[in-house]
Structures are given as C-alpha cells and as structure tokens.
C-alpha cells in the first residue's frame, strides 16, 4: 500500500521486499500471542468435549494462558512452530502489500479513475487477501498443528512429512476455503480503514507526523480486520488441527457449515475465541507492519530517486 498517493511509484520487487521485512518484524515480536490465540480457538466447550478428548487445558485469559504454557511446557513453547510462519512470512506479507498495490491499479483501470477511493481500497485489499491465502495455507496448517497443546510432532518437517504421508499433498491445503474468507475480510477491513483514517487525520508535514498517522491507522485497521475475520479464523484453526489419523470427531469441513456447527453447539461467543490475544497482536502488529513497510518504501524511494 502506498504510503502517499503522490509518492513516486516503485517496481514490484521493492514492494515485495518492504512487505517481507514488515511481516518478519511483526512476527518476531508478536508470535507468542498467536500461540495463545490458537490455544483458545482449539478449546471446545461443549458438554461432551472432555469425553471425546478435545478439552485438555482451560485458560482463563491471555496472561493465564501465557503463564501455564511457560510453567508446564517451557518458555520455548511460546515460539513452537515459528519456523513455518517465518518461512511463510516473507511471501505472505509481501503478497499482502505488493498485490494490494497491483490490485489498486487494476481496479482504477476497471473503474476508469486515477483516484484511490475507499471502495477501491476495500476491493483491492480483499483481492490481495484471497491471493495471499493461496500462498500461505500449507504453512498455516503446519503452524496450527505445531501450536496445538496435543501436538506430538517432533518439528515442522516431521509434521510436513506425516501430513503428506497420511493425507497426500492436497492435505496441506486443508482449510483453504476458510483461509480465503479470513484473509479477504481482514485485508479488506484493514486497507479500507487505513484509507479512511488517513484521510480523516490532519495532513502529515513531517516524518514524525507520518509515523504517528500510520501507527493510528494501522492499529484501527488491525482491530477492525480482526473483528471481521475472527469467526473464520476459528473455523480455519478447527479444520486444520484435525489430521487424518486423529481419533477426534471430524465435524469441521467446509467453512460456512462449520460456522453453524460451532454456533449451535457452543454459542455465538465461541466464534470469537482467541479474539483478545488476536487483537492484542494484530492492532499493534498492524501499526508495526504499516510503519515498517512505509519506512522501507521511503528508503527505497530515496535510493532510487534521491532525496
């Protein structure tokens, strides 16, 4: 996403690198909250959950979850499975930002306008999210299975090998539909809100003011995106966590039917399991990504065009 509508354009490779650096920066700082989010989302709260072996540990909040993980499993567990999203992060975030810029150009041509409107920002963001989903699904599946409290995999490569052996190559794409829904809604909300917030704030005249505006816009965008996509993220986690050899009941398949199953069995609140750690990660994470991405783009712009 361009940090300034009047800024000189940069080739795709610069957008790709800027997005990759932004994503890896956010992941390194915020990953423990992603582990907490997954633990909450995989908690099944039906009366029969314990009987089918789904309820292993109950957590009473983000801090309680962090404490229990460190106490019972060790500090390193907070970063268990990070190698998979770390490998994913560069193409994921690069796709998010670079494809968003490319889709903006496509929609501007489609609607015969030179202006980036909020509708174009939302459409471009959602389209970039769906493209991003196709890239990240295998990495997401490995990450979810590694983060699960019941995980017995020796590492990401062990998880990858066993998944392919037991479920085939296509098993790595389990949950792609829910991932596309999740990413389209988050990206559409994130980029749409960033556009609106930036236009509503006083024009930044200094680098410090631009950074402030990006921090605020990114935080609000990350929060709105999280509110929109959390139910689909819960479904994605449930679908991807169950492997082919598991004894768990396989009742989560397609996205929308799974939403109804969770709602009927556990209530509306279950669709927002993990919302607090998720928003605690993605609100400041959204700010961090936007600031780093904008900073990297400005750095490359200075290199290419001079001050």
Swiss-Prot record:
This is Mitochondrial 2-oxodicarboxylate carrier 2. Transports C5-C7 oxodicarboxylates across the inner membranes of mitochondria. Can transport 2-oxoadipate, 2-oxoglutarate, adipate, glutarate, 2-oxopimelate, oxaloacetate, citrate and malate. The main physiological role is probably to supply 2-oxoadipate and 2-oxoglutarate from the mitochondrial matrix to the cytosol where they are used in the biosynthesis of lysine and glutamate, respectively, and in lysine catabolism. The chain crosses the membrane at residues 10-30, 76-95, 122-142, 171-191, 215-235, 280-300. Pfam families: Mito_carr. It is a multi-pass membrane protein. Solcar repeats lie at residues 10-106, 116-200, 209-299. PROSITE patterns: SOLCAR (PS50920). Belongs to the mitochondrial carrier (TC 2.A.29) family. It is found in: Mitochondrion inner membrane. Its main location: mitochondrion. GO terms for biological process: aspartate transmembrane transport; L-glutamate transmembrane transport; malate-aspartate shuttle; mitochondrial ADP transmembrane transport; mitochondrial ATP transmembrane transport; mitochondrial transport. GO terms for cellular component: mitochondrial inner membrane; mitochondrion. PANTHER family: MITOCHONDRIAL 2-OXODICARBOXYLATE CARRIER. It comes from the Eukaryota. Keywords: Membrane, Mitochondrion, Mitochondrion inner membrane, Repeat, Transmembrane, Transmembrane helix, Transport. The lineage of its organism: Eukaryota, Fungi, Dikarya, Ascomycota, Saccharomycotina. The keyword Acyltransferase does not apply. GO terms for molecular function: ATP:ADP antiporter activity; dicarboxylic acid transmembrane transporter activity; L-aspartate transmembrane transporter activity; L-glutamate transmembrane transporter activity.
């Amino acid at each position: 996403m361009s940090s300034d509508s009047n800024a000189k354009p940069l080739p795709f490779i610069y957008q790709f690198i800027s997005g990759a650096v932004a994503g890896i920066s956010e992941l390194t700082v915020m990953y423990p909250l992603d582990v907490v989010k997954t633990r909450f989302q995989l908690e099944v709260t039906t009366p029969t959950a314990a009987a089918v072996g789904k309820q292993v540990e109950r957590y009473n909040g983000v801090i309680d979850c962090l404490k229990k993980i460190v106490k019972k499993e060790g500090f390193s567990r907070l970063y268990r499975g990070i190698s998979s999203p770390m490998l994913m992060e560069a193409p994921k975030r690069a796709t998010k930002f670079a494809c968003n810029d490319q889709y903006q150009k496509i929609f501007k041509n489609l609607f015969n306008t030179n202006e980036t409107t909020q509708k174009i920002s939302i459409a471009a963001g959602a389209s970039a999210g769906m493209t991003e989903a196709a890239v990240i699904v295998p990495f997401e599946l490995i990450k979810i299975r590694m983060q699960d409290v019941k995980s017995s995999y020796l590492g990401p490569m062990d998880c990858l090998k066993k998944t392919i052996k037991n479920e085939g190559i296509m098993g790595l794409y389990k949950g792609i539909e829910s991932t596309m829904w999740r990413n389209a809604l988050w990206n559409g909300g994130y980029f749409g809100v960033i556009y609106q917030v930036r236009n509503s704030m006083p024009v930044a005249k200094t680098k410090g003011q631009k950074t402030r505006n990006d921090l605020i816009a990114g935080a609000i965008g990350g929060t709105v995106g999280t509110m929109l996509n959390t139910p689909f993220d819960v479904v994605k986690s449930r679908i991807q966590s169950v492997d082919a050899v598991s004894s768990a009941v396989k009742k989560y398949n397609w996205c929308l039917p799974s939403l109804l199953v969770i709602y009927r069995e556990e209530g509306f609140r279950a669709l927002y399991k993990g919302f607090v750690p998720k928003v605690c990660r993605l609100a400041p994470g959204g700010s961090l990504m936007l600031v780093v991405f904008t900073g990297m783009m400005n750095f490359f712009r200075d290199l290419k065009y001079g001050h």
